[in-house]
Structures are given as C-alpha cells and as structure tokens.
Amino acid sequence: MGIVIAVYGKGGIGKSTNSANLSTALAMKGASVLQIGCDPKHDSTFPITGHLQKTVIEVLEEVGFHHEEVMFEDVVKKGFANVDAIEAGGPPAGSGCGGYVVGETVKLLQEFGVYDKYDVILFDVLGDVVCGGFSAPLNYADYALIVATNDFDSIFAANRLCMAIEQKSARSKVQLAGIIGNKVDYVNGGGTNVLDKFADKVNTKVVAKVPMHDLIRRSRLAGKTLFQMEEDGQDVCIAPYLALAEQLLSEKPFATVPKSLGDREIFELMGGWM
C-alpha cells in the first residue's frame, strides 16, 4: 500500500495549484499518483487534465446513486505525467452539503480498492473546514500538508488545521508532513519570516517555499502544470515541488504531531512577530 496525503489550507490560498504541481512532481519521481479533488468547484485537477472533468456526484446522479452501478473507470481520468484524477464535486452553490459528497467519495474509493493501486493518493480538500465529510481524508491519510502564506489570516487558519490534525492523530495514523509556504515574496512580503516562527512554535517546519511568480498565475489560466510551462522561471518554480516530492517518497519522510496554539495565544504571539 502506498502513502495517502491530504492537503488543507485557507480558502483561496492556492491548494489546488500546489496539489496539482506536487502530484506531477511525485509522478516525475516515478510514483503512480491519484489526485482527488474534494471541492464542489471541481477545479482541483484542471491543471492536470486540462479540462473540468465529470465529477463523482454527477456520475452517481446518472445511475440514481446506486454505487454498485459505477465503475472506477467512470470517475477517473488520466492526465499529464500519467497522473490519474478524480473530482468529488458537490451540490450547487447555496444548497446541500459538500462535506457529505466528500465523505461519500471516500467510501466509494474504498469500495473500488484504490488505496492499494497507487504509490501516492493525494486529497486536495476544500478550505480550512475539517468537520464532517471534509475531515474524512484525514481518517485514511498518512500525512497532511498545510498550504499557507506569510500573513495573519492564513496562519490563523493553519493553526486551526493543526488542531484538527492533532486531534485526529490520537485516533488515526495521520501526522503533519509540514507547511507549504505559498506566494513567497522576499521583496515585499517578508519571505516566510512569520510562517517560519509559527511552524517552529507548533512543532513542524516549512517544507517547501513556492515563489511569488507570474508563471504560476499563467499556468493556472492555461490549465497546465508548471512542468508544462517551458518558459523563463520554470526551474525556480518547480524546484520546491521536486524537493518536497523526493522527501515524501523517502524511506522516512519528515512528519510530526503538531502542537497547536490556542486562539488567543496565536493572536498575542503574531502581534509581536509582525
């Protein structure tokens, strides 16, 4: 059985872009990879497949939600670097429960036996909400990764995620494999100065520092991974993903049980860090 990774972070922080590029980097290192998008927007795997694929919920609707009539091939698409992609999907905006759909998708994948078919399964999970179905990937994950930027709101959300992972680790095998620092800007944004202090405080570290670079924005608009953008800046943009992929595939990847901070404590600490 391979490793299962769950990627979390504040809404809009860049989880899907980071997940798609990390999945590709893992594949480039020789791993068989399945990425599962767990967001009603169903755009997690867009850079890998180049289009918005049919979601699990759409396939289930077509067969009246009879799981037994769905085949694995009905919900998976092969994308760049032979990365397989699945989108859970969800109800229309303003109705239903996206977390329920994620939970049902996780169950369906278990029925398919996919956890034994890949070297790496990566869940890209909606926002920083880890209740109900959105926490389901943590029940199967070996490792969680948090995507964050060097600002208060992002780090506050990361601390809440550390709380969830800390609690889950008492009942399951999941550990935190570190923080991906996103949109790192050493000129105007302080690099990762605050993020590094936070990581040290909660018993983890920043394991990748993805630069603030226009190539990343343009790759997302183009529906491509950075590995397909053969332009100036590609090397510096893909380097963090390749290094993190190598670390995750190593015999003993870095991983810890986080020691989250209280809400008031993090307010007080970060006021002094800024």
UniProtKB/Swiss-Prot annotation:
| Cofactors (names) | [4Fe-4S] cluster
Binding site residues for ATP: 12-17, 41
Enumerate the InterPro entries for this protein: NifH/chlL_CS, NifH/frxC, P-loop_NTPase, Protochlorophyllide_ATP-bd
- Pathway of this protein? Porphyrin-containing compound metabolism; bacteriochlorophyll biosynthesis (light-independent)
The name this protein carries in UniProt is Light-independent protochlorophyllide reductase iron-sulfur ATP-binding protein
Organism lineage reads as: Bacteria, Pseudomonadati, Chlorobiota, Chlorobiia, Chlorobiales
Taxonomic source organism: Chloroherpeton thalassium (strain ATCC 35110 / GB-78)
**In which residues is [4Fe-4S] cluster bound?**
97, 131
- Biological process (GO) annotations? light-independent bacteriochlorophyll biosynthetic process; photosynthesis, dark reaction
